[in-house]
Amino acid sequence: MAAAGGERQLDGQKPGPPHLQQPGDRPAVPGRAEAFLNFTSMHGVQPILKRIRELSQQQLDGAQVPHLQWFRDVAALESPAGLPLREFPFAVYLITGNAGSGKSTCVQTINEVLDCVVTGATRIAAQNMYAKLSGAFLSRPINTIFHEFGFRGNHVQAQLGQYPYTLTSNPASLEDLQRRDLTYYWEVILDLTKRALAASGGEELRNEFRALAALERTLGLAEGALTRLAPATHGALPAFTRSNVIVIDEAGLLGRHLLTAVVYCWWMINALYHTPQYAARLRPVLVCVGSPTQTASLESTFEHQKLRCSVRQSENVLTYLICNRTLREYARLSYSWAIFINNKRCVEHEFGNLMKVLEYGLPITEEHMQFVDRFVVPENYITNPANLPGWTRLFSSHKEVSAYMAKLHAYLKVTREGEFVVFTLPVLTFVSVKEFDEYRRLTHQPGLTIEKWLTANASRITNYSQSQDQDAGHMRCEVHSKQQLVVARNDVTYVLNSQIAVTARLRKLVFGFSGTFRAFEAVLRDDSFVKTQGETSVEFAYRFLSRLIFSGLISFYNFLQRPGLDATQRTLAYARMGELTAEILSLRPKSSGVPTQASVMADAGAPGERAFDFKQLGPRDGGPDDFPDDDLDVIFAGLDEQQLDVFYCHYTPGEPETTAAVHTQFALLKRAFLGRFRILQELFGEAFEVAPFSTYVDNVIFRGCEMLTGSPRGGLMSVALQTDNYTLMGYTYARVFAFADELRRRHATANVAELLEEAPLPYVVLRDQHGFMSVVNTNISEFVESIDSTELAMAINADYGISSKLAMTITRSQGLSLDKVAICFTPGNLRLNSAYVAMSRTTSSEFLRMNLNPLRERHERDDVISEHILSALRDPNVVIVY
């Protein structure tokens, strides 16, 4: 399903004249009432939109609406034992289906047609959704559902389930289920409630919407004319005040208690702000997207006495809604459920049938087993790095991933592959001596050492689980008495030119492009780079591209210096590019005295900057004609007139100060680049198009794995997303002042900034899937331990926030599409839904290998949820989308 391609009338609107869409135009969505869908999916998606709209517009009775005083009473409670029974009304719409069936893509249409808040269960899910939405139109950043309901870093270590709860009825009522969930999540719920009420400054209600409503009445405007603009006039408003439709992608990764937590926080926030939707007695509508058979909710508990982290599986939101009779009947799930069928990631018929068998719990036949047999190879064949180069290995545990990465690095060191070079970078952990001593006192472990504590908490200190996958060396500790810190250092091994992913939302400085002429021409033609810069003003993006184009124009002349080119075509190329430059810069004599656009741009340069006048290179009075006077003459003496790129002699880019000047400069430089591209494309064809093309904002030298540059100033600040594909190009010690300022601002009080400035970590250099080169900021994560309601700021970790795509856990691969996949299952603890996730990552079964056939091995299978899904498929009220 795409965001363009077909049009259908909604809600009985009168048909109008057809919209003639020009290439590159954004489809018009007047009043957000028309959906632009792919014709093959249009009829299946329209009922989904209609039902969600109906649910979002249904009004409640006044007695059902929770009042603000109820939340004030909750904030005054010391324990959840005093929580009264109270219904928090909500509605649910489920969108489920097998892997790659288009569930997440459906959200594109929901986002365009309905006013909704789109979120993800995890950062990866949120950023994957952002990539889909921004691919069609510019999109606001997509946050996790935790961020939207107010979850904070100190809640990560909250102790869940401290207070036991027994349901008071059988079958349990909705009120009883919601009170159980609030009791289980009490520590977080209480903190969220107190923070929200404290933010009101002691006032009964927040004033943002009341002030706009008063202004509407004063100006005689229609109700809602101004209040609906509140998110624009008050940028800090919570997203839940904007809409009552909340979309959660990959909802199967959330524990069941988070369903009630989201509903509770929506009501609390809207009651506090007294929003128009609260005044209209509307309820939250949760659109839960995911697959209950693919995903599972996990909860971890750390035992301080044993220094051991235990992980257990809990009931997830999707399974909770589908299997719990009370919720199923309350939500009228038969009328609020859409199931997407058919794997669009891998469209092979036999493989698609296998995916349906695993998704819907259908009987596994001998024919299915024989089909999977063809993918089985010996385990040592998969774990041997010499085999299957370029394939992604999937393992069941982080320990297996780390072991394979160590084996891969050892192999690369021995073979010394020219393209793939192994190098190490330091990772630092700063442990507070004061907080560590307090931790030992509270846990009654006076003999505990920092080394032992760091080893046991390695997976908790960083802000991403993939840190356990890394091939790290022996840890070394240093004591800094002045700062009262212990600094633990690990050397982590990386592979140059390998595919990696960033694991957190990190700032990056884009400073150049490295790819081919064809790739850069494609960027300029469709403005894809500008569209992805939703974090900044587009003028900065155009100014940055102008710098790259100006620096890269000389590459066309460099290409013509390559040996083996036809001399006649080379001469013709020089002549035609010279004519193009003369035309663009208006170098030909003109009778009119009116200044041209190019001359105005050249004269608008910075003070003191003048283009070099190469016409002065002729013979001077009193000197011999054949002997150059200075070094500059020596340089140009070796070039004939055609080989000299006169563009640089007559044009100085300067720094445009207005929006119009920025666009004018970009248009001129873009015209120069595309004109030269067409000339060489016609003369040399594909040999030119695929030739290497690199351009940077400053002089750049790659010496082995290290990038050397004078200064990356002039680059573009942006954000590295987890959904982008990156290649590791090396590292640099060049300082980026914006990164250093952020470090001092955030971590000056912990003395970490001081130590990092004395011995700075390098920045990694990455190239994204489009070819743009970036320096990525250091990933700083803070670890706060929670012991008996006491919070200890134990450690701060500084690393690079990257993980390899050469190998990962099956859980990490959730939601990804991988070209070539080799899977190593663990025979003793095999879950069929995990095997389903791993196998469904591939885009072609031709590039799928595994160490065993999970269908023939002893495995666990969740048949309960499958029975409910099969029952839904037979229900005529459930929407089926093919």
Curated annotation (Swiss-Prot):
It is found in: Host nucleus. Component of the helicase/primase complex. Unwinds the DNA at the replication forks and generates single-stranded DNA for both leading and lagging strand synthesis. The primase synthesizes short RNA primers on the lagging strand that the polymerase elongates using dNTPs. Possesses helicase-like motifs and therefore may act as the helicase subunit of the complex. Pfam families: Herpes_Helicase. Residues 1-29 are annotated as: Disordered. GO terms for molecular function: ATP binding; helicase activity; hydrolase activity. Its EC number is 3.6.4.-. It comes from the Viruses. This is DNA replication helicase. The gene is HELI. GO terms for cellular component: host cell nucleus. Changing residue 67 to R: In strain: Nonneuroinvasive mutant HF10. Belongs to the herpesviridae helicase family. It is an enzyme of class 3 (hydrolase). It comes from Human herpesvirus 1 (strain 17) (HHV-1). Disulfide bonds: none annotated. GO terms for biological process: bidirectional double-stranded viral DNA replication; DNA replication. Changing residue 14 to R: In strain: Nonneuroinvasive mutant HF10. Keywords: ATP-binding, DNA replication, Helicase, Host nucleus, Hydrolase, Nucleotide-binding. InterPro entries: DNA_helicase_dom, HSV_HELI, P-loop_NTPase. ATP binds at residues 97-104. Associates with the primase and the primase-associated factor to form the helicase-primase complex.
